[in-house]
UniProtKB/Swiss-Prot annotation:
One of the record's GO molecular function terms: structural constituent of ribosome
Protein name (database record): Small ribosomal subunit protein uS4
S4 RNA-binding domain mapped to chain residues: 95-155
Gene3D superfamilies, per the entry: Ribosomal Protein S4 Delta 41, Chain A, domain 1, RNA-binding S4 domain
Entry GO CC: small ribosomal subunit
Alphabetical keyword list: Ribonucleoprotein, Ribosomal protein, RNA-binding, rRNA-binding
Organism per entry: Bifidobacterium adolescentis (strain ATCC 15703 / DSM 20083 / NCTC 11814 / E194a)
Length: 208
């Protein structure tokens, strides 16, 4: 799949789910805030409880760019964690390496953040980690590899060009953009994680 095809797919998915998954999708979604297709402008019929919860699960999956298997694993892990299952799910997903690369402003989209990790541009505590699903622990530092910092995408990131299209840096990250370095200072709290989701609906979907 080419970058253009991937971009179009993300825009279409954004409109179907009712959330902007990329900066380009945000621009288009503002102009056409309805589902794609011939009947996109018509009012959506009353949905079943199942359909509502299914869409909420799909929204969460899309925002983290993960597979069904990965999301279900986060749910299963959450059921064995103290506290509310949904909050535990969000905290777990938010500590993914690719998610934090995006939150720090090193990348513009989730897909780009994942690509940077897979292509071995990202260090965790000085060591290359090429698994997007790697869970970063409080106190650990992520940084763009010194050799990679000369690349145009990272030079742009260091200048803060992505900050206008990304949510504000969350309180659990201490970011030094010029150095392309960020530290996870503590566990993320569910209410401060910048994703659009009714997490209880997701829990109810899997618990049914």
């Amino acid at each position: 799949m080419t970058n253009v095809q991937r971009s179009r797919r993300q825009v279409r998915l954004s409109r179907a789910l009712g959330i902007a998954l990329t900066p380009k999708a945000q621009r288009i979604f503002e102009k056409r805030p309805y589902a794609p297709g011939e009947h996109g402008r018509t009012r959506r019929r009353t949905e079943s409880d199942y359909a509502v919860r299914l869409r909420e699960k799909q929204r969460l999956r899309a925002q983290y760019g993960i597979s069904e298997k990965q999301l279900r694993a986060a749910y299963e892990k959450g059921t064995h964690t103290a506290g509310q299952t949904g909050n535990a799910m969000l905290t777990d997903l938010e500590t993914r390496l690719d998610a934090l690369v995006l939150r720090a402003g090193f990348a513009r989209t989730t897909a780009q953040a994942r690509q940077f990790v897979v292509h071995r541009h990202i260090l965790v505590d000085g060591n290359i980690v090429d698994r997007p699903s790697y869970r970063v622990k409080p106190g650990q530092t992520i940084q763009v590899k010194a050799k990679s910092q000369t690349m145009v995408p990272f030079q742009a990131a260091a200048e803060g060009v992505h900050r206008d299209v990304l949510p504000a840096v969350p309180g659990y990250l201490d970011v030094n953009l010029p150095s392309l370095k960020a530290t996870l200072t503590r566990k993320p709290e569910a209410e401060e994680i910048p994703v659009q989701v009714n997490i209880q609906y997701v829990v109810e979907f899997y618990a049914r």
